[in-house]
Amino acid sequence: MRILVTNDDGITSVGIKALADAAIRRGHEVLISAPSDQCSANSQHITLTTPLIVHEKPWEGARAFSVKGTPADCVRLGPFLTDERKFDFCLSGINNSENAGPAVYYSGTASAAREAAMAYIPAMAVSIMKGAGERALETLAGMAVRLAERFSGETLPRCTFINLNAPNTDPEAWKGFKVCPLSGAYFKDNYVRRKNPYGTTYYWLDGEEGSAIAMEEPEPGSDYDLLNRGYVTCSFLGPYQDYNADYLEKIRNFRG
C-alpha cells in the first residue's frame, strides 16, 4: 500500500517514528507529512491566511516532510508532495496520550484521520496512554499497520475512520482487543485565576485533580473504561448523524 503518515505531536516525535517504521518494515511505500511543531488539540483547524512552509527531512525507507501547519494541513497537502497524488491509507499517530471519548473532537491526531477520510482515503488514528515504553509503542505500531492491511482495497464509508487506543503497560499485560463505543464522560475543567509578574490576570487550565485532563467516570464498556482496564480499544467513527426526525414536530409550524 501507499501510506500517508502524519500526527499532531510533530515530525520528531517517537510515536510517528514507530508508526512509519512499522509500515516500512511491512514493505509499504510510505510518505510522511507531519507538523514541524507540537499541534495537540488543534482539532481539524486548517491554515488559510499564511503559507505552509515545507522542508524535506531524511528518513530511511521513506520520504518525509516537515510542514509548518496543522495535522489537517499535512493531510490535505500530502497528495501534492508526491507525483502519484494518491494514497491507499492514512495512519495518524502514535499520539502520546489516549484519544478516547470526547477527546477525539479536540485531537489533532484523530482530526487528521478524519480529514483523510473526508478526502476518500481510508484512515486510522493511533494513540497510547502517556508513559508508554518503547516496546509498547512498537507493538501498537505493528498492530496498527496489520489492521490497516485488513482494509487494503476496501472503502470505509466516507468520513469514517478507525480510532485505535492502547494502554501504557507492557504489551504482555494487555488484556485483549475490543471494538467499543466512545465514552461520553466529559472533562472536569478547573480554570485557575492567576496574575503574571506584570499584574495581568490570566486563567490556566488545571484539572480538578491537578491535571489538565480529569474526567468523569466512564460508562462500562466504553473506550475509556476498557482502556483503564487494560484493553486495546478500536472504534469506527463517522460524522453524519442528525436528530431531525426527533424534533420535527416541535418546529413543524415554525416560520422564524
Locations of the language-model features?
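Short, Asp-centered acidic motifs that coordinate Mg2+ and/or phosphate
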Residues: 89
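C-terminal accessory domains and tails appended to enzymatic cores
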Residues: 157, 167-256
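Short glycine-rich anion-binding loops that position phosphate/pyrophosphate groups of nucleotides
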Residues: 9, 38, 70-71, 95-98, ...
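A cross-family phosphate/adenosyl-ligand binding-site feature
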Residues: 3, 13-81, 85-86
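Short, glycine-/small-residue-rich phosphate/pyrophosphate-handling segment
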Residues: 124-151
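Glycine/threonine-rich flexible loop motifs
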Residues: 98-107
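Short beta-strand segments
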Residues: 33-35, 92-95, 126-127, 164-167, ...
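Hydrophobic/aromatic ligand-binding patch that stacks against planar heteroaromatic rings
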Residues: 22, 112-116
